[in-house]
UniProtKB/Swiss-Prot annotation:
InterPro entries: RGS, RGS_sf, RGS_subdom1/3, RGS_subdomain_2. Its main location: membrane. Disulfide bonds: none annotated. GO terms for cellular component: cytoplasmic side of plasma membrane; cytosol. CDD domains: RGS_RGS1. The lineage of its organism: Eukaryota, Metazoa, Chordata, Craniata, Vertebrata. It is a peripheral membrane protein. This is Regulator of G-protein signaling 1. SUPFAM superfamilies: Regulator of G-protein signaling, RGS. Residues 72-187 form the RGS domain.
């Protein structure tokens, strides 16, 4: 059986689509696994950079401020940077819809009355409806109660569902967050930087 001969030089192949060969050779890049991991971690935790600004002031985020997050979920969520770091943690656990819903409810409470209906429907469709893409984990009664309340929306129509999600985060996600590498590495890095 005759063997097939392939030239070592792609240009010697006649009748082939040179653009396909060029694409394949251009896609080869040096392996930079370590750099990719660092880039991934930075995207997950952008707050590890030493120049991170605090949400309360123009000061750099301090280890004391981050340590206060361990006192309660309320203190963590009262801090913009805390919300961001906790949100990144929830993303790593595939449960970011909880904080997204909680933040949407907080924003909703500041809504002008003429915009309530539109905003309530958006939040309901995004998080509460049984077919929502980012459906939150609430019981049937709370889901039905919220559905009724948005028919005549008030600033408090999501309060019951928001409380359920807050309790879920407080009892489930928040304790794991405090033990996570995301939180502990951030705290350790800030403590190390303060000693310099």
């Amino acid at each position: 059986m005759p063997g097939m001969f392939f030239s070592a030089n792609p240009k010697d192949l006649k009748g082939t689509d040179q653009s396909l060969l060029d694409d394949k050779t251009q896609k080869r890049r040096p392996k930079t696994f370590g750099m990719d991991v660092k880039a991934y971690l930075r995207s997950m935790i952008p707050h590890l950079e030493s120049g991170m600004k605090s949400s309360k002031s123009k000061d750099i985020l301090s280890a004391d401020e981050v340590m206060q997050w361990s006192q309660s979920l309320e203190k963590l969520l009262a801090n913009q940077t805390g919300q961001d770091v906790f949100g990144n943690f929830l993303k790593s656990e595939f449960s970011e819809e909880n904080i997204e819903f909680w933040l949407a409810c907080e924003d909703y409470k500041k809504t002008e009355s003429d915009l309530l209906r539109c905003k309530a429907e958006k939040i309901y469709k995004a998080f509460v409806h049984s077919d929502a893409a980012k459906q939150i984990n609430i019981d049937f009664h709370t889901r039905e109660s919220t559905a009724k309340k948005i028919k005549a929306p008030t600033l408090t129509c999501f309060d019951e569902a928001q409380k359920v999600i807050y309790t879920l985060m407080e009892k489930d996600s928040y304790p794991r967050f405090l033990k996570s590498n995301i939180y502990l590495n951030l705290l350790n890095d800030l403590q190390a930087n303060s000693l310099k």
